[in-house]
């Protein structure tokens, strides 16, 4: 048995970044992009998930490292920390989860800069390795993790930019089958982001309109066999806008929209070459040899419109203490067929904020259906205030 192929298959299933394929979707209508370390694109926090997986232009919070690090420069609190937990694919297994720790600290004159960091850990649960006869060889616990460091700065009163550097490690467990193969792979990546916000007055109400972008996971490829079969990182372009307006005293409503495009070229398929195996093998080799940067440019020529995913969501806030959220995520059948609603709520009291979200998939038998997320956040300014410190 090829142990690592089996584990890789588990990893692809576990991250569930493509939908549960329906029988009525023809091969010509279903061609999702495949990458390595796909857990990097799983939404870590409950707030973003409850609005349909968006956050490029929403108000900054401790989890902005994933959505748009440049937002930290506009954060109202000087510092914040957040811990999120997501049980993953609980309809199928009960030991796969994503844990995420993120935080930031404002620096510089007038707090116009921020440093940030995050640690995400994706556990693939417990996997039993067997030989060809079905005998147990070992029990392993594969995982994927990433550590980020970020920096953001206001370039004007309305615009900021940010960068993040990331170290990625994917460990598929102990190698029990082939001493010439490695069980782990690592890579480095970077994000580049920007955020613009302004406060237009409509009637007698001061509103807030924001725009944001984040180009994430631009970096080296990952490989478990010495570079013979490298995989692209899940590079992604996220564009978003958000508009907040007051409904009444202490009542605000935010409407947000995000659009995403994977910056990875689709893997060639044999059916696209009318059975010409030689042409297919040549195209596959070109795809494997292509650099990550070249792949980014080529990704825009591959059914561009069909590969854009959309998220639309809303957040109602009462006195910045009670929050109700909802949203919808859409991906075409061609790109993966993930379509689902998100909903959630949050409660903030002094220094602590608690958020929860729930996913309802519209596709039948989707493993993403009923996904729960929980986030616990701490306002460090509030903690200092309670302690009576400046």
Task: List the predicted regions and their residue ranges.
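Subset of outer-membrane beta-barrel
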Residues: 22-390
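Acidic, glycine-enriched active-site microenvironments
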Residues: 13
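Bacterial N-terminal signal peptides that target proteins for export
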Residues: 1-8
